[in-house]
A protein has these predicted regions:
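Short, solvent-exposed loop/turn elements at domain surfaces
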Residues: 63-67, 186-187, 237
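Residue-level detector of secondary-structure boundary/capping sites
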Residues: 47, 109, 146-149, 153, ...
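N-terminal "assembly arms/tails" that initiate or stabilize quaternary assembly
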Residues: 1-88
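Sequence/fold signature of self-assembling virion shell proteins
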Residues: 2-40, 105, 153-156, 190-330
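A generic structural signal for short beta-strands and their flanking turns/coil linkers
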Residues: 50-52, 173, 223
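Long, contiguous amphipathic alpha-helices that act as assembly "spine/axial" helices in icosahedral shell
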Residues: 56, 81-143, 167-181, 294-309
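Extended, solvent-exposed, turn-rich assembly/linker loops in the middle of proteins
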Residues: 138-220
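Residues at the C-termini of beta-strands that transition into short coil/loop
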Residues: 60, 181, 231
Length: 330
């Protein structure tokens, strides 16, 4: 008997009902930046009904006095002096709205997904505000690298400059570094004498080599700097000559200030080790008929609002340094 192909197939124009698509109700994962800058800054708060400007002060350190006091003579009183630093908070806000019909027919939990996406925007906003404050002093805190790419020597040089200016490390007795993954690659590939490869012969490199395995999400410590990675770093230049900022931060470098009860509200992401908050806790408001929307055409709103500022706390002795390094990978 002669071979006869199937008459009915999925591409047959006679069977249009087969031309259907199954739509997954679960959104695919997003590529998101990790937020590191708020974590290395110093937190503070303005109480409500106390204005929107905060002022800090510090006493100027006195020098030594090696002159012996003359016997029987009352000396001269030493005057004390202070300096002040001020910062003014600003409002940041965004919202997204969903129609009632979209809320009724969407195949996904559309309000929840809108809230999650807007929350990431809020978290990225805070991280970038703090990073921009770090970058604003680049001309005063920049340290030249020994070569085009970052090395352990460069990190050690930043630590030496900071300690040479009497800048203390952070509370864990280490300076904190924020670094792009491309720069981490170059540091790990540093095979010069005293470089990463050489140092790891005598150290326990497991945390650094295994990536963000530490409980605090860091890449490990090298050259006196405990490092966290993120792609949300400052850059300069254009491809293929982009320079990536590497931040080495001591205690009291940059402050972050919120208005009491109206500051950023982080949601810690358990999927990200050491996460300081990858999203915001946004407000979700269900719609319905109201004087502004008598017909109830708006089904829901998601929004955030926070009052915040980042400020360099010491512009006489900057308490951090920035390296600008090319990346061998790109």
């Amino acid at each position: 008997m002669a071979y006869a192909p199937a008459v009915s197939t999925t591409t047959s124009p006679l069977l249009p009902h087969l031309n259907v698509t199954y739509y997954s109700r679960k959104a695919l994962s997003q590529v998101k930046k990790q937020f590191r800058f708020a974590a290395v800054s110093e937190p503070d708060e303005i109480p409500r009904r106390s204005g929107k400007t905060v002022q800090w002060y510090r006493y100027l350190a006195l020098g030594s006095n090696i002159t012996p006091a003359p016997e029987g003579t009352v000396g001269v009183a030493i005057p004390q002096q202070t300096s002040t630093v001020t910062a003014t908070v600003s409002e940041y806000a965004d919202f997204s709205s969903i129609s009632t019909l979209a809320d009724e027919v969407a195949i996904d939990p559309i309000t929840t997904n809108h809230a999650t996406n807007l929350g990431y925007r809020g978290g990225l906003t805070v991280d970038t505000i703090v990073r921009t404050e770090f970058d604003s002093n680049l001309s005063s805190v920049s340290v030249a690298t020994a070569g085009p790419y970052a090395t352990v020597f460069d990190l050690k040089k930043c630590v030496a400059f900071l300690r040479g200016a009497d800048v203390l490390p952070k509370e864990d007795n280490e300076f904190h570094g924020i670094i792009h993954p491309y720069a981490v690659f170059d540091i790990q590939a540093d095979n010069t004498a005293g470089g990463f490869v050489d140092v790891m012969k005598w150290a326990k490199p497991s945390v650094f080599l295994e990536g963000q395995a530490a409980a605090d999400g860091s890449m490990g410590e090298v050259g006196g700097v405990r490092m966290w990675t993120t792609t949300n770093v400052g850059t300069s230049g254009t491809a293929p000559n982009v320079l990536y900022n590497i931040y080495v931060v001591g205690a009291g470098a940059v402050g972050r200030v919120a208005l009491q009860g109206s500051g950023p509200n982080y949601v810690v992401d358990p999927a990200v080790v050491g996460s300081p908050g990858e999203e915001f806790n946004v407000k979700v408001v269900r719609g319905g008929p109201n004087p502004a929307d008598p017909e109830g055409m708006i089904g829901s709103f998601v929004s955030y609002r926070f009052v915040f500022v980042a400020k360099t706390l010491d512009s006489t002795t900057f308490r951090y340094r920035i390296l600008q390094a090319d990346a061998s990978l790109v």
